[in-house]
C-alpha cells in the first residue's frame, strides 16, 4: 500500500461508535487538512473538544443531532445512502469549542472535516438547501457536485468541503489539476483528502497522484470507504463501467481560495467542441 492510500480502520472506540478513517497531521504528510469518518449506532454519542481546529460535521447517511453550547440541531441528515445523490445537512463549528453528535437512526455515518481555525466564527447549520449544485464536464468527463463549504462561503475561516458524484465510465478531477503552489491569482496552495464510496460496494475506482517531475507518482486501486491523501500534485479519478463513485473532498491551505492549475499535457481536452 502506498503512503497516500488509507484502508478502513474499522476501530471501535466506544459502544456504538466506530472510526472508519482517522487522518491527521501526526499520521499523514498533511499540515492543514484532517478527516475522520465515524459510523454510529442509534443512541450513541460522540463528543470532541476542538482546540485550534475548526470542524465541519457532515451527516453522510442517517439522522443525527449535533449540539454545541446552546446550539442544538436535531435530527439533521437527508438520506439513507449517499447514492441517493441529494444534498445533506452539515454543521460548522469553530475552534475552542466542544460538540456532541448523537445518532438518531439505527445507523448513521458522519464525516468530520478539520482545518486550522484562523478566527472565531459562529456555530452554523448548513442546510441541504444551502448546498449549491453543479453539473460539470462533458463527454466522459461528467460529474455532479454538491458544494457544502465553497470558497465563496463566509461560514468557515479555512475549510473547503465538497461532495462529488461520478458515474461509471467517467473521469473526474479531470483533466488532471493541482493546487500546490501559493501563486495567486493563478494557483492556490491547498492540501486535499478524498473519502470514497462506491456503488455497488464491491467495486473499485482508480486514482493517480503525481507531480510534474514525478518525484511523487502513485496510482491506486481505491475501494469502498478508502481514503486518499493529496499533499501535492495532480489527482485525477477514473471510474470503471458498471460502478458509480462518490467522494467527499476536504481542502485547506494558507489562503481559503480554490484556484487550480491543469496539467498542460492534458488541458487540450477542454478545447474540444
From Swiss-Prot:
Pathway: Polyol metabolism; myo-inositol degradation into acetyl-CoA; acetyl-CoA from myo-inositol: step 4/7. It is an enzyme of class 5 (isomerase). Pfam families: KduI (PF04962). One of its GO terms (molecular function) is 5-deoxy-D-glucuronate isomerase activity. InterPro entries: Deoxy-glucuronate_isom_IolB, IolB_Bacilli, KduI/IolB_isomerase, RmlC-like_jellyroll, RmlC_Cupin_sf. Keywords: Isomerase. GO terms for biological process: inositol catabolic process. It catalyses: 5-deoxy-D-glucuronate = 5-dehydro-2-deoxy-D-gluconate. The keyword Isomerase applies. The keyword Acetylation does not apply. Its EC number is 5.3.1.30. Belongs to the isomerase IolB family. NCBIfam families: myo_inos_iolB. Involved in the isomerization of 5-deoxy-glucuronate (5DG) to 5-dehydro-2-deoxy-D-gluconate (DKG or 2-deoxy-5-keto-D-gluconate). This is 5-deoxy-glucuronate isomerase. The gene is iolB.
